[in-house]
Amino acid sequence: MFKKIIASLLCALALQGCMAFIAGAAIGGVVVFEGRNWRQQNIDNRITVEAEKKLNADEELHNSSRIIVSSYNGDLLLAGQAPTPLLKQRAEEDLRYVPGVKRVYNEISIGGPISTLTESSDAWVTTKIKTEMLANANLRSSSIKVITENGTVFLMGMVTKTQGSIAADIARESSVVQRVVTLFSYKSDGTKVVH
């Protein structure tokens, strides 16, 4: 019951514009409880910064595309929109050799940038899913990164197959989610990661 009350309060805060509070709490929780060690977290942060720098340095990509990047355990997710398949591929090629990147998931769609309203909806969906995961006693939600882009939810992290299934089910329950993409590294015995 207590977890449901906390989850409801977090949702209410998010709807009132307190996203910075929730994001700060979520980021703080990730640092303390997630499955990556501090070294890997640092590598992932550097991957994200370097990838964003490279995208911004490519003038054509920067001016015509909307691309977001997220790194977890060396896996780099590219999502967003590019006007042509050529630019989609170029973004991947530009970022494939960023130091620390093990694998690139290119989920960029072809088309124009999404609206601010859609971006806001995506942020709300991410907050809602993270809150529901936090309220689930069977899930270590701090080991899962949730990214929502144009109604598609991407789940990244190091989890067991059971936890991955629970997380995907929670994400699918949202009525506005069009698709759920799981990009997990699975732990077979609690420590070993199977890609």
Tell where the protein language model's regions lie, with residue ranges.
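N-terminal targeting leaders
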Residues: 2-3, 9-10, 17-195
